[in-house]
A protein has these predicted regions:
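Amphipathic alpha-helical scaffolding segments comprising HEAT/armadillo-like alpha-solenoid repeats
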Residues: 36, 60, 72, 180-189, ...
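Ankyrin-repeat boundary/"N-cap" motif
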Residues: 8-17, 39-51, 73-86, 106-121, ...
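Ankyrin repeat structural motif
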Residues: 23-31, 57-66, 90-98, 126-127
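TPR-adjacent "capping" and linker segments in tetratricopeptide-repeat scaffold/adaptor proteins
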Residues: 1-10, 188-195, 207-208, 223
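Short inter-helical turns and helix N-cap capping residues of alpha-solenoid HEAT/ARM repeat scaffolds
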Residues: 227-228, 269-270, 300-301, 336-337, ...
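Ankyrin-repeat C-terminal turn/loop position
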Residues: 34-36, 68-70, 101-102
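Structural detector for internal amphipathic alpha-helices that build alpha-solenoid repeat scaffolds
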Residues: 13-20, 46-55, 79-88, 115-116, ...
Length: 427
């Protein structure tokens, strides 16, 4: 558990100080500046990683881990204990402390004890256990926080003590580490205690989808037929992940998943569930999947249209979209919802055949008021070898400080396009 006064003072190194303060943007800016000064030799983020963990800034620690931090280089005494992490209820903190490079630091007896601790929190309920430990009947302050790069958890503060409600996800993680096979029903129950953005939900879905066995598939099928939209939503994500984690499109559970999602798309009435179902078709392009997507091109809910737009990209071996898909992409690139426009532009870029109607519509997005739309349009035009990407990239300028990693992805397509043109220019 984290209590008031858990962190104090300021580290001398600016990167460590930014990590300790919880300033993710500054952390990324400092790493970029170090890259520039050292001509490509990135500053070691390991000390900042340790500082972020000590301050319980788990999202920053997760980012630093992705950017090269080495947990094995941090002495155990400079990290929170595993018991502190479990009590705090942060799945990301537990993940960092049990990283593959330092997992050997914990004997099985300790992992068993931590599993029992996580189960105790989970079974008691975060609020009830927090009240028991603090002895306070005051009002609990609640908020939602980013725990890692992708998932959020609830955070509760009472009598100067702060905890997160990720104990169910931690329990799932520790059981997997210990080789304990949790029942499908229990994993579903843990997921449905939370919402779709919570770590407990995603962790249960991933664990179940990796079980390429009849029992797990039957669980997805049962959820699909449930009257409760929340249960169907979890079933849709689980079915989608069966397809995502398949070794090939010919794998048994991939075939089953695509068939189920395609049929499901014609019958689902809940927009949130429908969007998840359609997202499940985005990496499998075929006539039936395309027809299921096109059925919802004009859906009244933007999230559904975004799923349609994302699913209409064409794989490299088949460059030509159908006439209906072509028209849908033109329509969706002019959608009133910005995220729909971005998804449609991305899919149009996937086609990469120089189609004039598509490239002209992409080029119209270069004047969009939002930079993220302009970036996507530059990238898509470059993939179509359309020279309009070059001037547009020049107008956008270099990636913004703190956003280099993301924006470089979009701009470098135009840079790659420009280099051959420069090489062939008369000298």
């Amino acid at each position: 558990m984290q209590t008031d006064g858990h962190t104090s003072g300021a580290a001398e190194d600016p990167l460590v100080a930014a990590a300790k303060a919880g300033d993710k943007l500054r952390v990324k800016q400092l790493l970029e500046e170090a890259d520039d000064r050292c001509q490509g030799d990135r500053k070691d983020p390991t000390a900042a990683f340790a500082a972020a963990l000590q301050a319980f800034h788990t999202e920053i620690a997760d980012t630093l881990l992705r950017l090269g931090a080495q947990p094995a280089d941090v002495p155990p005494e400079e990290l929170p204990s595993l018991r502190q992490a479990v009590d705090f209820g942060s799945p990301a903190l537990v993940d960092a402390l049990t990283h593959s490079s330092i997992r050997h630091r914990y004997p099985r007896t300790e992992l068993n004890a931590m599993r029992d601790l996580a189960r105790a929190w989970h079974e008691a309920g975060t609020e009830a256990e927090l009240r028991r430990r603090t002895g306070s009947s005051d009002t609990i302050a609640r908020t939602r926080v980013q725990d890692d790069e992708y998932c959020t958890v609830g955070e509760l503060t009472l009598a100067g003590t702060t905890v997160r409600d990720g104990h169910g996800a931690i329990l799932t993680h520790l059981e997997k580490m210990l080789g304990i096979r949790t029942s499908c029903q229990e994993l579903v129950a843990r997921a449905l205690e939370r919402d779709a953005d919570h770590t407990a939900w995603s962790r249960a879905a991933i664990e179940l989808s990796h079980r390429r066995q009849p029992e797990a598939w039957a669980t997805a099928e049962t959820l699909r037929a449930d009257a409760d939209p929340l249960r169907r939503l979890f079933g849709a994500e689980l079915t989608r992940l069966f397809e995502v984690f398949a070794d090939s499109h010919d794998e048994e559970y991939c075939v089953l998943a695509v068939a189920a999602l395609t049929d499901w798309a014609t019958a689902e009435t809940d927009p949130t569930v429908l969007a998840e179902v359609l997202h499940g078709l985005s990496s499998y392009q075929g006539p039936r999947a395309e027809a299921a997507l096109l059925l919802h091109t004009h859906h009244h809910v933007p999230a559904v249209r975004r799923a349609v737009a994302a699913g209409l990209g064409t794989p490299p071996h088949s460059r030509q979209p159908s006439d209906a898909a072509h028209q849908a992409l033109l329509t969706l690139m002019n959608d009133p919802d910005t995220d729909v426009q971005i998804a449609a532009c991305h899919s149009a870029g996937d086609i990469a055949n120089g189609d004039r109607a598509l490239t002209d519509t992409m080029a119209s997005l270069l004047d969009h008021p939002e930079r993220r739309v302009q970036l996507q349009a530059v990238h898509a035009l470059a993939r179509h070898h359309d020279e309009r990407c070059v001037q547009a990239a020049e107008r956008l300028g270099p990636p913004r400080p703190g956003y280099r990693e993301d924006e470089t992805y979009y701009l470098e397509a135009a840079w790659r396009y420009e280099r051959p043109r420069e090489d062939t220019s008369p000298g």
